[in-house]
Amino acid sequence: MLKTTLLFVVTALAEIIGCFLPYLWLRKGGSIWLLLPAALSLALFAWLLTLHPTASGRVYAAYGGVYVAVALLWLYWVDGVKLSAYDWAGAAVALLGMAIIAMGWQRS
């Protein structure tokens, strides 16, 4: 389960970086060259999704929980926004959902 969770975290980071760089270009006046690493990051994200150990729909459902948690950590570390109790509670519920789904596919 730890290996799967770490793979989900790396996958989430690839997706977030791939989306954040165009945001910097479009909204913050960044260089158009940000689109090149963004495209590479999104390609890495798509490839990483193929490494997960079960059917794609189940992977996407479980991955969503980890994505929520990683996105909130990004909000805190990169955007400098203090997380609320609701943020932490939402992340905990999302991660619990991911764990339940992952336990189910490991038993199948």
UniProtKB/Swiss-Prot annotation:
Entry's transmembrane regions: 6-26, 31-51, 61-81, 85-105
Localization of this protein: Cell inner membrane
Domain of life per record: Bacteria
GO cellular component terms, semicolon-separated: plasma membrane
Keyword Membrane: yes
Membrane topology: Multi-pass membrane protein
UniProt entry keywords in alphabetical sequence: Cell inner membrane, Cell membrane, Membrane, Transmembrane, Transmembrane helix
Pfam families: UPF0060
Family under the similarity heading: Belongs to the UPF0060 family.
Alphabetized NCBIfam families for the sequence: PRK02237.1
Protein name: UPF0060 membrane protein CJA_3703
